[in-house]
């Protein structure tokens, strides 16, 4: 979606290009001028299987298969899978407190849409693809659905989606909100548009105190003149009920490890280059003994790419399980991470060894399996901080220290057991955040 990112933020172009500072008027003009090109771009994405060809009109605010449910409709925007989990956790708590509410969840990705279909079948939830931020497309969307309130999850902030919602005088909330330091700097280069966008919500639920400060600065608030509440509630991605798993799959992996007398090393939520790095590191270790290295990529469609790098291995998506003398196994499915966490002797949490920003550490910490991560953890900085201090997570900064840390972590000690117990308690407490956030949200909506 590089073209859309440039429209959203022209300062994301390569260094050396003339910097372009957006005003609201110029932003709208860019969308209107580039609208036909963006339409063409979306149809190209259909060929790449990155868009649903049967629902492509939803990206233009039209062609919805579902009708607006009667009664109160709360709109939650969750761009992709991670935000989608936070949205579902929030919906579950809001539904407990307000049984007559209905929920519309918009997403940007097919994977997130499939996750909603799988997990919300018996909930008052409707899914739609996010309209792109062309002023007319957003207007069509709001006119069709007529939401009674809007909640934007995490860090996907689109100017027209936010400001047009604000113009309709709807309660507008940013929840589980965070923004990277580099993104903050880019927004600061466009102060007119940033201030109007970030001062629009009446409530911001930030993930930590640093994020609270970022949002207050972008909104142009100083101490004593804030027109909105910015409250720290933490990330909303995890809940205790997510500790359920595919028991048969989990037990099959444990039985394999028992029969093979090997340790299970799980490379979880990995991104490009990380599988190769972890495989090479583990293969050089002489003190680990027999092991099974399971790859559970963040995006399972990368399975062919991983096999081309590391060679043939059994695949979960084909109904296969590890066989004697297998060193690698590819768990290329969605919705089975908890079973993998439970079966593993150690978790190497991906998205943290290059520049992806890391993934939610709360979910694996719930299972009590020790975790290793890399240096790139800015997306969940506060949660990593407390879990690193507890000792259930260990952080490495090179392949050399990764290998050493794997060996040390597999040698369970009483100190590590205490760290795991402490980390599990922290993770369980974090899973209660959606309850706290729901109270703030209901109070704002019903004000």
Where are these regions (language model features)?
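Nucleotide-activated sugar donor-binding and catalytic core shared by glycosyltransferases
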Residues: 2-7, 13-447
């Amino acid at each position: 979606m590089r073209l859309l990112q440039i429209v959203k933020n022209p300062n994301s172009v390569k260094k050396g290009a003339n910097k372009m500072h957006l005003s609201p008027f110029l932003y709208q003009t860019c969308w209107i001028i580039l609208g036909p090109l963006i339409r063409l771009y979306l149809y190209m994405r259909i060929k790449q299987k990155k868009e649903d060809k049967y629902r492509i009109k939803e990206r233009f605010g039209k062609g919805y298969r579902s009708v607006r449910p009667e009664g109160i409709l709360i709109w939650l925007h969750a761009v992709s899978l991670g935000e989608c989990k936070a949205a579902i956790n929030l919906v579950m708590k809001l539904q407990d407190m307000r049984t007559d509410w209905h929920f519309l969840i918009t997403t940007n990705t097919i994977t997130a849409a499939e996750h909603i279909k799988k997990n919300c079948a018996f909930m008052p939830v409707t899914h739609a693809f996010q309209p792109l931020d062309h002023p007319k497309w957003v207007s069509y969307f709001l006119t069709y659905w007529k939401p009674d309130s809007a909640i934007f999850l995490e860090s996907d902030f689109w100017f027209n989606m936010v400001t047009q919602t604000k113009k309709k005088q709807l309660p507008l909330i940013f929840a589980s909100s965070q923004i990277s330091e580099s993104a903050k700097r880019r927004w600061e280069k466009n102060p007119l548009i940033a201030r109007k966008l970030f001062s629009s919500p009446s409530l911001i639920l930030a993930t930590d105190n640093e994020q609270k400060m970022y949002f207050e600065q972008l909104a142009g608030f100083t101490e004593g003149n804030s027109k909105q509440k910015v409250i720290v509630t933490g990330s909303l991605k995890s809940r205790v009920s997510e500790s359920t798993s595919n028991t048969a799959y989990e037990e099959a992996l444990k039985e394999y490890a028992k029969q093979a007398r090997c340790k299970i090393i799980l490379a979880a939520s990995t991104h490009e280059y990380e599988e190769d790095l972890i495989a090479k590191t583990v293969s050089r270790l002489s003190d680990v003994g027999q092991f099974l290295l399971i790859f559970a990529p963040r995006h399972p469609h990368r399975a062919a790419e991983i096999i081309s790098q590391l060679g043939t291995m059994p695949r979960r998506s084909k109904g296969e399980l590890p066989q004697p003398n297998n060193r690698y196994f590819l768990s290329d499915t969605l919705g089975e991470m908890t079973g993998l966490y439970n079966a593993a002797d150690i978790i190497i949490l991906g998205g943290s060894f290059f520049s992806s920003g890391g993934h939610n550490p709360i979910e694996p910490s719930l299972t009590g399996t020790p975790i290793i991560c890399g240096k790139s953890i800015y997306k969940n900085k506060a949660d990593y901080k407390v879990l690193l201090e507890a000792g259930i997570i260990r952080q490495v900064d090179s392949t050399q220290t990764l290998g050493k840390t794997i060996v040390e972590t597999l040698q369970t000690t009483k100190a590590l057991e205490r760290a795991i117990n402490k980390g599990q308690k922290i993770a369980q407490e974090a899973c209660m955040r959606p309850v706290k956030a729901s109270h703030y949200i209901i109070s704002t909506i019903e004000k």
